[in-house]
Amino acid sequence: MTQKNLLLLCGGGGDEHSISLLSANFFETQLATLPHFNVLRVELNAKGQYRTQAGELCELTNSKQIRFNDQSKAPWDVDYVIPCIHGYPGETGDIQSYFELINLPYFGCDSEASSNCFNKVTAKMWFSALGIRNTPYIFLNEFNQQAIEETERALEKWGSIFIKAASQGSSVGCYRVDNKEQLANSLEEAFKYSPYVVVEKTINARELEVAAYEVDGEIIATKPGEIICASNTFYSFDEKYAENSQAQTVIEADVDEVIAKQIQEYAIKAFKGMKLRHLSRIDFFLTDENEILLNEINTFPGQTQISMFPKMLQNHGHNFAQYLSGNIMAQLK
């Protein structure tokens, strides 16, 4: 088999840059077991600069080449890209739009699906359109007195709320508010991360996650795993990634089989309905009354040592490297 040149693009320069690098480490490890890929890892920084692991400045050109600033070095033809970038500009769909413009095949969801899922406003509209219940919410497009008053009414109605920047991942710009004293400051902070803000009712529920992905053209939804947070906390950025995190992860949650099957069916419905591709992690709430609510969809889930997606995929009986290779080669035929 002829080797294919695979660009592992990571970083992105956003709030999740460091996590993207950790995920890229996992992809590198898996790709190293696949001799038919010749891998070049390139980091994209906040200034929009591309740099190899050897520290060489370079750029991805419209002719689908990595061109080095050192003119004495020959350009490197790119056959395929893995955009291992959490948050902007990866999960937002921006970098995928560029790949589509230059007709460069890549791993993961396309630009439109990525954008629709990443923005919490459009995502929740899609969930409702697909007939999948989700948390009650309002959304705001400006930080002003009217927004504060609307949020105060939501707090009075629901008792406790989450204020979330609409265009952020990994709980960046996300604040739990239980009283009016916290409200205005939390709202102002959320608007620093995004021009749109979602205000959601706080749901006291179990947090369940499903790995939804494709193998040989078939959509797979694993049994739900579970995130167990310390009492009265939520799964914040620090809880997800800090070494001293108190959160626990369970690869296969202890839930009724009927409930688990329903969650898997919702995950597949969301995957199909939102035109996802290759991989996703779909997160749900399960209330004490066994009500299932779709929380969010992550179109490029983390692949760190503590990340659920690769563990759930493996627990479901799939080898990650072979799953990855199968999806890549299907596009390169």
Swiss-Prot record:
One of its GO terms (cellular component) is cytosol. It is found in: Cytoplasm. Binds 2 magnesium or manganese ions per subunit. Its EC number is 6.3.2.4. Keywords: ATP-binding, Cell shape, Cell wall biogenesis/degradation, Cytoplasm, Ligase, Magnesium, Manganese, Metal-binding, Nucleotide-binding, Peptidoglycan synthesis. Mg(2+) 2 binds at E296, N298. GO terms for biological process: cell wall organization; peptidoglycan biosynthetic process; regulation of cell shape. ATP binds at residues 154-209. Pathway: Cell wall biogenesis; peptidoglycan biosynthesis. Its cofactor is Mg(2+); Mn(2+). Residues 124-329 form the ATP-grasp domain. One of its GO terms (molecular function) is ATP binding. Cell wall formation. This is D-alanine--D-alanine ligase. It comes from Shewanella halifaxensis (strain HAW-EB4).
